[in-house]
Amino acid sequence: MDVTRLLLATLLVFLCFFTAYSHPPPEEKLRDDRSLRSNSSVNLLDFPSVSIVALNKNSKQISRKEAEKKRSSKKEASMKKVARPRTPLSAPCVATRDSCKPPAPACCDPCASCQCRFFRSACSCRVLSLNC
């Protein structure tokens, strides 16, 4: 009984290897020179043509100036963000990054919320979004 199972298992493994290695990948099937030439010409026609243009010094300087303007405008835009007035802090509140277990009062920061981990054993006030 054990010999027949061993023989069947060996036969099954041999058949698996035979079927896996008997089929070559598609790129290995084409070994003929004619098929390689026709295949390569088809591949070259599939891709769009590329044109190479030489840049002179003026165009490089203009692009640098434009890049610097974009950088400065982005910095100015980030600086122009108006800070909204904070709400007055109520006395019973929890500061950011302090413990805020459920019987504790709410977080002081209006953008913060109480996040609990490890089955509500470790809770702390955290700011979730920076754009709040």
From Swiss-Prot:
Biased composition (Basic and acidic residues): 63-79
Region of interest (Disordered), residue spans: 61-87
Superkingdom per UniProt: Eukaryota
Domain Agouti: 93-132
One GO BP annotation of this record: melanosome organization
One annotated Gene Ontology cellular component of this protein: extracellular space
Main localization of the protein described in the UniProt heading: secreted
Range of residues in the leader sequence: 1-22
Matching InterPro entries: Agouti, Agouti_dom, Agouti_dom_sf
UniProt xrefs under Pfam families: Agouti
GO molecular function, one term: melanocortin receptor binding
Keywords tagged on the record: Disulfide bond, Glycoprotein, Knottin, Secreted, Signal
S-S bridge residues: C93-C108, C100-C114, C107-C125, C111-C132, C116-C123
Glycosylation sites: N39
Annotated coiled-coil segments of the chain: none
PROSITE patterns: AGOUTI_1 (PS60024), AGOUTI_2 (PS51150)
Localisation per UniProt entry: Secreted
Free-text note on domains in this protein's UniProt record: The presence of a 'disulfide through disulfide knot' structurally defines this protein as a knottin.
Its biological purpose: Involved in the regulation of melanogenesis. The binding of ASP to MC1R precludes alpha-MSH initiated signaling and thus blocks production of cAMP, leading to a down-regulation of eumelanogenesis (brown/black pigment) and thus increasing synthesis of pheomelanin (yellow/red pigment).
Protein name: Agouti-signaling protein
Organism this protein belongs to: Macaca nemestrina (Pig-tailed macaque)
Gene (UniProt): ASIP
